[in-house]
């Protein structure tokens, strides 16, 4: 044998050993995992393919072409199975075929050398053609990773740009959701879909208050306000800034420096101008807005409620405390709550709500800590004096009962932690309600809990009297508390008229459209029968509401074929995990076994809320698609001794956390693969446009890439728009645009509101969890888009940025 031939044989032996080893490992993993999957009632594919691949490995070690043919047969079967299992969806096919295709290309390109080694006809041409075509197909698959794959394609019809009515042109963004009804719609069109590509950074401001990025600590989730030439900001520790609307230069700073052991965030501030005339309601029978006391010290005010339980008013002109508000500018929100109220058990994270001359405040009560927790009482204060005007105590037989000295509000009652809305024509405040303590066990719940938990509540803003309440989950055991600001819209009815409505999205991926006056649904809602679990004494509801006439977003009933992974290996493990859990669809009740909740307690939709374009009756909403596995475990005497404070990372794999005062501790975690990737198929987060005239999805696109994240938190650097979990909210404009920033990658994006096409994006220094806002400067007439960037959720990169963009001159 000549030296070159001997050398080639050595190379072939080494290569066949490496290739055979790869086949053996793959086949063995398939056989072991596939056997387990079959035992759980799952697919036979992995076991059958594994046996074929393992056998092909032994022939490959022997450098025999039989190994190639066996693997080729396995690959053909894989392609057929993948098409049957996943259809023609890109990401599911990518997961099933990319790795096997790589092995197939390798064995086919090895075939001529093996046949030559066995002194057979090499078959070079067909082997190289098939191998080359497979490589080309893989390159096509790689190219497809960088193309957005819409889950719902737009019709192609371009919505016309409607000129701004001068009477409706936006002057200020002076509420958390732009207006009191939370539209997040900007009636400005200087920046529009035709020129947004020319948007450039105009200024950059730094607060000096950094986030931690853990998800459980300090997070920047702010939406700024703008009034006149001032932009008002707050930081995770509730420090307030006023900056110049054109230059971004600091005008004043109000030091607050609130602290908590966990969950430090300020989603926004509130603004009130006492020099403006009061707007009285026009609805017949509505209670008048209360008159104000004389006010000269602070004619214009900015309010923040803090994570350590204070409501603070500062002068909007100077930043100085308004001494006539409460005690030297501060109201103590711990008053009347009883013991154990220290944050993070009791906190206020969402912006306070200005409702006429009343400022309304809810609270965040820590989840799954104890049956005895601070009450979720809703309180309203005079905007000038800070005196308590009314309280709504959901567990009290008289919710508006006025406490006597030494009394406290009912413990563990239903709270409202998200932003509220206000209708000045009705003088009514609309509240998204949470759950009574604890969230995943309801054995101690009262009739009042069942009434108010996970409901939309309408209260008279002057008196606090209940107008109506609408329940969206019965005996909520899933932590499906209503997470977002109710949106007040004029809803198009099928007869061509419109009705004042409240629209709210839920963690369960549903939308409820309610008559604003009566609270009755304006779209069809059914009661869906559900299965119960095995918890003794649990007050199971046998049915749950389903809003069937509105789109369902990311809450489909999962099947084994919906399981996904970056490779077939983690996909197989996700299949095993899925089949190992009890799962009955959307309302799978927690039990003593391991069950799956999809979507989980993050949603679905969360606090980012909805943007509504009244010119076209389009609604825009982002979502995340994360499952949650959960198990209730009987507590031991040792568990009872543990004192939880509400700062535990119960969703990040720290183990079972005792729920004091209940029979159980709870163990739960996100339904993810070993690589830290959600187990169900992408997208994991989308932007959806809903045409409210037809009540259908107009378009839906994935949000975010894996450029700044990836498996096990490793930054992949790939601009592959797979669609990642989102937080924060959208902003729509009359310029035909939807802006969004709260993705896992570090971008502010602008989409065409007609079809979801990305028209522009700007790289941010770190990620954002904030909602963009926009205004037109009264000095320069220039429109700005502003967003905060303190770091994406659980990102290693933290910041303190507020950045404005405007068109180039």
Swiss-Prot record:
UniProt pathway annotation: Aromatic compound metabolism; 3,4-dihydroxybenzoate biosynthesis; 3-dehydroquinate from D-quinate (PQQ route): step 1/1
Catalysed transformations (reactions): L-quinate + a quinone = 3-dehydroquinate + a quinol; shikimate + a quinone = 3-dehydroshikimate + a quinol
Residues that span the membrane, as ranges: 14-34, 41-61, 68-88, 90-110, 127-147
EC number per UniProt: 1.1.5.8
Main localization of the protein described in the UniProt heading: membrane
Enzymatic class: oxidoreductase
Biological-process GO terms, alphabetical: 3,4-dihydroxybenzoate biosynthetic process; quinate metabolic process
Induction: By protocatechuate.
Cofactor: pyrroloquinoline quinone
GO cellular component, one term: outer membrane-bounded periplasmic space
Protein family: Belongs to the bacterial PQQ dehydrogenase family.
Role noted for this protein: Can act either on quinate or on shikimate.
PANTHER family xref list: QUINOPROTEIN ALCOHOL DEHYDROGENASE (CYTOCHROME C) (PTHR32303), QUINOPROTEIN GLUCOSE DEHYDROGENASE (PTHR32303:SF4)
Protein name: Quinate/shikimate dehydrogenase (quinone)
Lineage: Bacteria, Pseudomonadati, Pseudomonadota, Gammaproteobacteria, Moraxellales
């Amino acid at each position: 044998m000549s030296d070159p031939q001997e050398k080639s044989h050595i190379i072939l032996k080494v290569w066949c050993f490496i290739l055979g080893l790869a086949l053996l490992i793959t086949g063995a993993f398939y056989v072991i995992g596939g056997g387990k999957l079959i035992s759980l009632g799952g697919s036979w594919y992995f076991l059958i393919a594994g046996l074929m691949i393992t056998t092909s490995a032994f022939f490959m070690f022997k450098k025999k072409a039989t190994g190639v043919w066996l693997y080729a047969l396995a690959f053909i079967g894989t392609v057929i199975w993948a098409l049957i299992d996943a259809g023609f969806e890109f990401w599911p096919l990518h997961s099933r075929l990319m790795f096997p295709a790589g092995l197939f290309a390798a064995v086919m390109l090895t075939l001529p050398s093996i046949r030559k080694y066995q002194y057979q006809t090499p078959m070079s041409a067909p082997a190289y053609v098939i191998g080359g075509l497979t490589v080309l197909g893989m390159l096509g698959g790689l190219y497809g990773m960088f193309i957005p794959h819409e889950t719902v394609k737009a019709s192609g019809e371009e919505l016309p740009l409607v000129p701004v009515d001068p009477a409706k042109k936006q002057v200020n963004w002076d509420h958390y959701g732009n207006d009191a009804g939370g539209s997040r719609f900007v009636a400005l069109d200087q920046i529009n879909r035709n020129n947004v590509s020319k948007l450039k950074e105009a200024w950059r401001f730094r607060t000096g208050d950094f986030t931690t990025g853990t998800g459980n600590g300090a997070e920047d989730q702010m939406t700024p306000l703008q009034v006149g030439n001032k932009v008002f900001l707050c930081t995770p520790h509730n420090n307030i800034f006023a900056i110049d609307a054109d230059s971004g230069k600091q005008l004043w700073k109000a030091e607050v420096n609130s602290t908590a052991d966990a969950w430090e965030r300020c989603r926004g501030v509130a603004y009130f101008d006492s020099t403006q005339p009061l707007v009285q309601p026009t609805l017949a029978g509505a209670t008048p807005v209360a008159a104000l006391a004389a006010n000269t010290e602070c004619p214009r005010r900015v309010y923040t409620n803090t994570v350590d339980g204070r409501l603070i008013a500062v002068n909007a002109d100077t930043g100085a405390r308004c001494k006539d508000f409460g005690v030297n500018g501060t109201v103590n929100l711990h008053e009347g709550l009883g013991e154990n109220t220290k944050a993070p058990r009791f906190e206020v994270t969402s912006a306070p709500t200005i409702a006429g001359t009343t400022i309304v405040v809810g609270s965040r009560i820590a989840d799954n800590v104890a049956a005895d927790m601070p009450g979720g009482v809703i309180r309203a204060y005079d905007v000038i004096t800070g005196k308590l005007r009314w309280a709504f105590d959901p567990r009290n037989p008289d919710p508006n009962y006025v406490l006597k000295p030494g009394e406290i509000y009912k413990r563990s009652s239903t709270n409202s932690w998200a932003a509220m809305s206000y209708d000045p024509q009705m003088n009514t405040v609309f509240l998204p309600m949470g759950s009574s303590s604890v969230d995943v066990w309801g054995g101690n719940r009262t009739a009042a809990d069942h009434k108010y938990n996970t409901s939309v509540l309408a209260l008279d803003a002057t008196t606090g009297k209940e107008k109506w309440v609408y329940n969206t989950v019965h005996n909520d055991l899933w932590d499906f508390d209503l997470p977002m600001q109710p949106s007040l819209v004029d809803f198009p009815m099928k007869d061509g008229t419109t009705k004042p409505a409240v629209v709210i999205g839920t963690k369960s991926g549903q939308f409820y459209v309610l008559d604003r006056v009566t609270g009755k649904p304006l779209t069809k809602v059914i009661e869906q029968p559900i299965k119960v679990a095995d918890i003794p004494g649990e007050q199971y509801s046998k049915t749950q509401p389903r809003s069937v006439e509105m789109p369902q977003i990311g809450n489909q009933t999962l099947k084994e074929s919906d399981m996904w992974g970056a490779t077939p290996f983690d996909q197989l493990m996700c299949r095993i995990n899925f089949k190992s859990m009890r799962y009955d669809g959307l309302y799978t009740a927690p039990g003593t076994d391991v069950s799956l909740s999809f979507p989980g307690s993050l949603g679905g939709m969360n606090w980012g809320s909805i943007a509504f374009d009244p010119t076209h009756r389009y609604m825009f909403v982002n979502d995340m698609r994360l499952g949650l596995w959960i198990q209730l475990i009987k507590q031991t005497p040792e568990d009872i001794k543990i004192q939880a404070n509400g700062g535990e990372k119960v969703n990040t794999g720290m183990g079972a956390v005792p729920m004091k005062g209940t029979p159980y501790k709870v163990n739960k975690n996100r339904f993810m693969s070993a690589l830290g990737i959600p187990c169900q198929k992408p997208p994991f987060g989308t932007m959806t446009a809903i045409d409210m005239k037809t009540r259908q999805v107009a378009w839906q696109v994935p949000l975010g890439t894996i450029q700044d994240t990836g498996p096990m938190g490793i930054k992949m650097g790939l601009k592959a728009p797979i669609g990642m979990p989102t937080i924060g909210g959208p902003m729509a404009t009359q310029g035909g645009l939807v802006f969004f920033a709260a993705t896992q990658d570090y971008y502010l994006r602008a989409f065409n509101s007609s079809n979801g096409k990305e028209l522009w994006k700007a790289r941010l220094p770190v990620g954002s969890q904030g909602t963009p806002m926009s205004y037109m400067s009264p000095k320069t007439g220039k429109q700005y888009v502003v967003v905060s960037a303190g770091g994406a959720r659980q990102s290693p990169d933290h910041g303190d940025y507020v950045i404005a963009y405007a068109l180039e001159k």
